[in-house]
Protein backbone atom coordinates (compact mmCIF):
# COMPACT_ATOMS: atom_id res chain seq x y z
CA UNK A 1 0.00 0.00 0.00
CA UNK A 2 1.25 3.49 -0.77
CA UNK A 3 1.99 5.78 2.14
CA UNK A 4 -0.73 8.32 2.77
CA UNK A 5 0.55 11.42 4.49
CA UNK A 6 -1.78 12.98 7.00
CA UNK A 7 -3.51 9.89 8.38
CA UNK A 8 -4.50 10.40 11.99
CA UNK A 9 -3.81 7.45 14.29
CA UNK A 10 -7.56 6.81 14.54
CA UNK A 11 -7.99 6.74 10.75
CA UNK A 12 -4.90 4.57 10.37
CA UNK A 13 -6.28 2.07 12.91
CA UNK A 14 -9.67 1.99 11.16
CA UNK A 15 -7.90 1.38 7.83
CA UNK A 16 -5.91 -1.46 9.42
CA UNK A 17 -9.10 -3.04 10.74
CA UNK A 18 -10.74 -2.79 7.33
CA UNK A 19 -7.69 -4.40 5.74
CA UNK A 20 -7.73 -7.28 8.25
CA UNK A 21 -11.45 -7.82 7.70
CA UNK A 22 -10.77 -8.58 4.03
CA UNK A 23 -7.90 -10.98 4.83
CA UNK A 24 -9.28 -12.95 7.79
CA UNK A 25 -12.11 -15.40 8.22
CA UNK A 26 -15.30 -13.73 9.41
CA UNK A 27 -15.28 -15.74 12.65
CA UNK A 28 -11.67 -14.86 13.53
CA UNK A 29 -12.16 -11.20 12.68
CA UNK A 30 -15.39 -10.91 14.68
CA UNK A 31 -13.93 -12.72 17.68
CA UNK A 32 -10.50 -11.11 17.93
CA UNK A 33 -10.22 -7.89 15.92
CA UNK A 34 -13.66 -6.29 15.87
CA UNK A 35 -13.84 -5.81 19.67
CA UNK A 36 -10.48 -3.96 19.78
CA UNK A 37 -10.09 -0.21 19.92
CA UNK A 38 -7.34 2.39 19.84
CA UNK A 39 -6.54 3.33 23.44
CA UNK A 40 -3.61 5.65 22.77
CA UNK A 41 -1.02 6.68 20.23
CA UNK A 42 2.18 8.13 21.66
CA UNK A 43 5.88 7.73 20.98
CA UNK A 44 4.93 6.20 17.61
CA UNK A 45 3.20 3.31 19.39
CA UNK A 46 -0.38 2.24 18.77
CA UNK A 47 -1.82 0.99 22.07
CA UNK A 48 -4.73 -1.29 21.24
CA UNK A 49 -7.32 -2.33 23.81
CA UNK A 50 -8.50 -5.95 23.97
CA UNK A 51 -11.25 -7.61 26.00
CA UNK A 52 -9.09 -10.10 27.91
CA UNK A 53 -5.59 -11.50 28.27
CA UNK A 54 -6.30 -14.45 25.98
CA UNK A 55 -7.36 -12.05 23.21
CA UNK A 56 -4.28 -9.91 23.81
CA UNK A 57 -2.03 -12.95 23.51
CA UNK A 58 -3.84 -14.17 20.38
CA UNK A 59 -3.45 -10.78 18.68
CA UNK A 60 0.19 -10.37 19.75
CA UNK A 61 1.15 -13.79 18.41
CA UNK A 62 -0.72 -13.60 15.11
CA UNK A 63 -1.13 -9.99 14.02
CA UNK A 64 1.57 -7.75 15.48
CA UNK A 65 3.90 -7.93 12.47
CA UNK A 66 1.08 -7.60 9.94
CA UNK A 67 -0.39 -4.60 11.74
CA UNK A 68 2.98 -2.88 12.17
CA UNK A 69 3.76 -3.20 8.47
CA UNK A 70 0.36 -1.88 7.43
CA UNK A 71 0.39 0.99 9.92
CA UNK A 72 3.94 2.00 8.97
CA UNK A 73 2.72 2.26 5.39
CA UNK A 74 -0.24 4.51 6.14
CA UNK A 75 1.56 6.60 8.77
CA UNK A 76 4.70 6.88 6.62
CA UNK A 77 6.98 6.29 9.62
CA UNK A 78 8.22 3.56 11.93
CA UNK A 79 5.53 2.53 14.42
CA UNK A 80 4.99 -0.16 17.02
CA UNK A 81 1.84 -1.95 18.14
CA UNK A 82 1.15 -2.89 21.74
CA UNK A 83 -1.94 -4.70 23.00
CA UNK A 84 -3.41 -4.12 26.46
CA UNK A 85 -6.41 -5.56 28.30
CA UNK A 86 -9.17 -3.02 28.94
CA UNK A 87 -12.14 -3.15 31.27
CA UNK A 88 -15.76 -2.64 30.18
CA UNK A 89 -15.40 1.14 30.02
CA UNK A 90 -12.15 1.12 28.10
CA UNK A 91 -9.54 1.67 30.80
CA UNK A 92 -6.29 -0.12 30.03
CA UNK A 93 -4.85 -2.56 32.55
CA UNK A 94 -1.14 -3.08 32.05
Question: Which residue stretches match the model-derived regions?
Answer:
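Intrinsically disordered, low-complexity basic tails and flexible linkers associated
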Residues: 1-91
Amino acid sequence: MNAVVGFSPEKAWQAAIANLEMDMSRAAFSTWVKPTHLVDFSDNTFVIGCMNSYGREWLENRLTTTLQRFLMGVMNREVKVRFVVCDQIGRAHV
